């Protein structure tokens, strides 16, 4: 595909080719749902132009913005949240003694709908704010919404980053292509050798919580923390690498999040594209921290409730978002009333805060992984009250799992705190080649290969 892209020569032909390839890629899941991407594209592109042309009429300008938001979020609500809210309303009515049937739709959730909806909506808002100019070329804009490397699981790109790159004439650069391949190789390692290996234990335990004790559930929760990180960050690396081979640079989505010393820092390092999107389009419009203190805390909580709902139509995701919101509220209050004493900057203290932050994140992951709130509460109860025995599995699992996690942590420590390149980025070509061959061999020998999809495809 990369060869065809560069052989096409003229940029207009390349962009048209990438657009066709992106739609073909998406239609492999459910062909009919490509119409949803096209609808979102046409609506946001048209509204962007109309918003810009209504610069002298604020009421008209805001009307086109609202129309874009209503249509896009309306589609998202219909496919992702209608059944959730219908079931919640039915449960509430039943609790009040009212027997009223609320119809459910039971429609198949379109892959990646939350990602491309947020990306398209962000474009319209940016045009409204005057941050960017409206894109005149429909094909270029359509590719921005549907660019296949990041279409189904992000990162949620910004128009100011990606649109200019589509207008540029890219020439093949071996060094760029090599960097892209290295990113893809590392992403595949994270997925196959850490995430999918850990998933074997995690699924066995979490899918049968009543038959497992606290020890197994605690280990499964810690392994899930690495599973979800490597699954999502692995895809982000593969997406960034695929784009890089053609000369495009996607935003960095993960920055060694498990070496954060606070929850605030964690969210600057975890799913950066979503956290920055929520900051710019939810938190700041609510007033951010430029409002009275209690409202500031409320803004934090609302933003993280939105983050939870973005991840899925289930009360477990709402609880996960609420927990992170509560963490941020407590941190913010501590900083307000205790100042630097609450979060000392001394290196030794900071290092001690890293495992505490990781433990808090892992506690929240329980609600993210559990299939219901009752199951999540059962997991919490068993971890803190019923140690039990560790679920037995073969030695090869622990060898592959722990070695994979060790390599991951070594790289993250080097990227976070160290200086100088690791083996894949060594200035010596022979070392780079040996590292790439070794990592490929590891993936082929110890990777878990099967039909397990990326976790974030469901969002």
Feature names for model-found ranges:
Residues 1-458:
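Membrane-embedded transmembrane alpha-helical bundles that form the catalytic cores
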């Amino acid at each position: 595909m990369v060869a065809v892209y560069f052989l096409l020569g003229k940029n207009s032909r390349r962009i048209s080719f990438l657009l066709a390839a992106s739609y073909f890629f998406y239609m492999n899941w459910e062909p009919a749902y490509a119409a949803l991407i096209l609808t979102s594209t046409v609506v946001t592109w048209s509204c962007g132009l109309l918003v810009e042309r209504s610069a002298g009429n604020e009421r008209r300008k805001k009307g086109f913005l609202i129309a874009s938001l209503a249509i896009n979020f309306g589609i998202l609500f219909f496919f992702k949240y209608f059944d959730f809210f219908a079931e919640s309303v039915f449960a509430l009515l039943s609790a009040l003694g009212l027997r009223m049937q609320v119809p459910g739709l039971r429609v198949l959730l379109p892959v990646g709908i939350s990602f491309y909806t947020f990306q398209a909506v962000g474009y319209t808002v940016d045009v409204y704010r005057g941050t960017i100019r409206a894109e005149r070329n429909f094909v270029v804009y359509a590719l921005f919404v549907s660019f296949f490397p990041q279409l189904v699981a992000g990162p949620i790109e910004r128009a100011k980053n990606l649109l200019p790159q589509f207008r540029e004439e890219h020439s093949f650069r071996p060094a760029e292509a090599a960097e892209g391949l290295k990113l893809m190789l590392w992403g595949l390692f994270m997925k196959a050798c850490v995430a999918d290996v850990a998933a074997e234990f995690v699924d066995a335990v979490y899918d049968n919580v009543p038959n497992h004790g606290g020890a197994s559930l605690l280990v499964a929760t810690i392994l899930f923390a690495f599973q979800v990180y490597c699954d999502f960050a692995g895809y982000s690396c593969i997406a960034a690498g695929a784009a890089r081979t053609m000369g495009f640079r996607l935003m960095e989505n993960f920055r060694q999040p498990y070496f954060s010393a606070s929850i605030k820092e964690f969210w600057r390092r975890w799913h950066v594209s979503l956290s920055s999107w929520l900051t710019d389009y939810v938190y700041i419009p609510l007033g951010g921290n430029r409002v009275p203190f209690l409202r500031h805390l409320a803004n934090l909580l609302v933003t993280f409730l939105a983050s939870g709902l973005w991840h899925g139509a289930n009360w477990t995701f709402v609880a996960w978002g609420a927990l992170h919101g509560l963490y941020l509220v407590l941190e913010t209050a501590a900083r307000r009333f205790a100042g630097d004493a609450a979060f000392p900057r001394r290196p030794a203290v900071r290092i001690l805060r890293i495992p505490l932050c990781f433990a808090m994140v892992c506690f929240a992951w329980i609600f993210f992984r559990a299939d219901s709130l009752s199951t999540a509460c059962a997991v919490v109860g068993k971890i803190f009250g019923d140690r039990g025995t560790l679920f037995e599995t073969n030695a090869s699992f622990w060898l592959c799992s722990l070695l994979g996690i060790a390599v991951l942590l070594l790289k993250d420590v080097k990227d976070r705190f160290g200086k100088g390149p690791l083996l894949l980025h060594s200035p010596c070509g022979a070392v780079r080649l040996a590292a790439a061959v070794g990592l490929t061999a590891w993936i082929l020998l110890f990777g878990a290969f099967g039909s397990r999809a990326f976790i974030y495809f469901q969002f």
